[in-house]
């Protein structure tokens, strides 16, 4: 006793219709990180003019995973209480969002370690905008590869 052709086609259609290609892009972690970045950059975050390592400038041999690893290393500066800059000490809401961002970006990272060159610096504002741009590109790429 096998499947009738009609039943096999119906089951196949159900299988296809539940895929992401039909329902649109659903990369929750990336979408949540981008939303958090939007909130942090829209709020007029304190310390936006402070300097952080410019780790998001890709060289020819830099992979996307390496950029994300470096970004997570920079964001760790806001995670541990001993490293928090004075301008964020009393801004628990913004600090919470930056910590959430650190956890999210670290979760995207598949590399165990990466080097951060601290010889070139950028403002926190420019760093967050660059990170947002990279992650939006990654999000769009993940959406188009599903369809």
From Swiss-Prot:
SUPFAM superfamilies, alphabetized: 4-helical cytokines
GO cellular component: external side of plasma membrane; extracellular space
Residue ranges of the TM segments: none
Top-level taxonomic group: Eukaryota
Record's subcellular location: Secreted
Disulfide bond annotation, renumbered to this chain: 47-87
Glycosylation sites (chain numbering): 61, 90, 117
Molecular function GO terms recorded: cytokine activity; growth factor activity; interleukin-4 receptor binding
Pfam families: IL4
Range of residues in the leader sequence: 1-24
Similarity comment text for this entry: Belongs to the IL-4/IL-13 family.
Official protein name in the record: Interleukin-4
Organism from which the protein derives: Rattus norvegicus (Rat)
């Amino acid at each position: 006793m096998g499947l009738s052709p009609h039943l096999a086609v119906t089951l196949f259609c159900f299988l296809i219709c539940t895929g992401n290609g039909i329902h649109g892009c659903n990369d929750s972690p990336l979408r949540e990180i981008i939303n958090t970045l939007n909130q942090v950059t829209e709020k007029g975050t304190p310390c936006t003019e402070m300097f952080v390592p410019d780790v998001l400038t890709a060289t020819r041999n830099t992979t996307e995973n390496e950029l994300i690893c470096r970004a997570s290393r920079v964001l760790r500066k806001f995670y541990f209480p001993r490293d928090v800059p004075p301008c964020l000490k009393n801004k628990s809401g913004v600090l919470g969002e930056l910590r959430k961002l650190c956890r999210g970006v670290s979760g995207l990272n598949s590399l165990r370690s990466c080097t951060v060159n601290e010889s070139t610096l950028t403002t926190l504002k420019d760093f967050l905008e660059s990170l947002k741009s990279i992650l939006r590109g990654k999000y769009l790429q993940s959406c188009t590869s599903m369809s």
